[in-house]
């Protein structure tokens, strides 16, 4: 008889789990609060709402970037423009420029 009562209690619990559709966990209460939707709704062709700290950080880092670019360009311009001396065209010969000699006709 005790086996029969034990079996009946398992059947009762199993029936509850079968009817609920899923097994319950401790402290669950049977309600799922997460939902399946998007947490941040996208807004078509609208700028996102920025916080003051995001605006400050973006302006700070963009200012730092431009400072670094202009500083390096001013002090190490050879890195951008090249470090070779610009050739003086007055010192080129006619032969180097591909100009035939005057006495040749």
Curated annotation (Swiss-Prot):
Pfam family, one: NADH_B2
Family membership noted in the UniProt record: Belongs to the complex I NDUFB2 subunit family.
Chain intervals with Acidic residues compositional bias: 93-105
Keywords: Electron transport, Membrane, Mitochondrion, Mitochondrion inner membrane, Respiratory chain, Transit peptide, Transport
Protein name (database record): NADH dehydrogenase [ubiquinone] 1 beta subcomplex subunit 2, mitochondrial
PANTHER family, A to Z: NADH DEHYDROGENASE [UBIQUINONE] 1 BETA SUBCOMPLEX SUBUNIT 2, MITOCHONDRIAL (PTHR15223:SF1), NADH-UBIQUINONE OXIDOREDUCTASE AGGG SUBUNIT (PTHR15223)
A single GO BP: mitochondrial respiratory chain complex I assembly
Function: Accessory subunit of the mitochondrial membrane respiratory chain NADH dehydrogenase (Complex I), that is believed not to be involved in catalysis. Complex I functions in the transfer of electrons from NADH to the respiratory chain. The immediate electron acceptor for the enzyme is believed to be ubiquinone.
